[in-house]
Amino acid sequence: MKNTIQDKTKLVNSVFSKVYKKYDLMNDIMSFGSHRIWKNKFLDWMNPQLNNTLIDVASGTGDIAKLFSKKTKNNSQITCVEPNKEMYSIGKNNLKNFDNIKWYRASAENLPFKENTFDFYTISYGIRNVSNINQALKEALRVLKPGGRFMCLEFSKVDNEILNKIYQKYSKIIPSLGKYIVGTSDPYEYLIKSINEFYSQEEFFDVICKNGFSQVEFRNLSNGISAIHSGWKI
């Protein structure tokens, strides 16, 4: 089990080290810009208030942190956590003008923060890349304040049969698209594989509940291409 976890950690790190320079561009192209709409809906449901504290895990290029800061008129304290060196550097540089945002390199399974610290914990398109999802959820629960909220945005299972057939066919061309734009298809073959192997909405709902969260619910976006899961620390 330990070797399997270590292998996945190395694989994921290698994937992001290959795509970091064109990460945002590929996201825009692959989703036809939809990922930006989904992220805004994510923040709308979150509805953060002034002076809230956020830990955003697997922050990538900093989209969620930036939207959270905008929602709170920059009157919030945001902690971005990113395990990959190259993604960390790009994200930190992207948000260098935000005095309320701090960056740390760490894994979702081992957060360097005290318990009961944050009002919100977010992870956007990152949870399926985590080597030990149960441990990551336990860490999320630990660092949230009582009454704090866990929110996850992730690719999920399409709930419309016709759309799903189109989606599956489109998914098969994404590695070729990646090779043309990034220069290698490997990261995008991993992307499609990781999406197909990840939990359904209902399965992930159960996993979140089993790791101690209360009032868990989810919402589908674009017929389940992506889904938002929410849970509370009570």
What does each of the following model-derived ranges do?
Residues 32-50, 67:
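Conserved alpha-helix/loop element of class I SAM-dependent methyltransferases that forms part
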Residues 23, 121-122:
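Hydrophobic beta-strand segment of the Class I
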Residues 134-149:
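A short glycine-rich, Lys/Arg-flanked "PGG" loop and its adjoining helix->strand segment in the class I
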Residues 10-11, 81, 153-207, 211, ...:
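C-terminal alpha-helical "lid/dimerization" subdomain adjacent to the S-adenosyl-L-methionine
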Residues 211-234:
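Core SAM-dependent methyltransferase catalytic element
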Residues 1-24, 170-171, 181:
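N-terminal, positively charged/glycine-rich alpha-helical extensions of SAM-dependent methyltransferases
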Residues 53-110:
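Class I SAM-dependent methyltransferase SAM/SAH-binding core
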Residues 109-121:
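A short acidic, Gly/Pro-enriched loop at the edge of an enzyme's catalytic core
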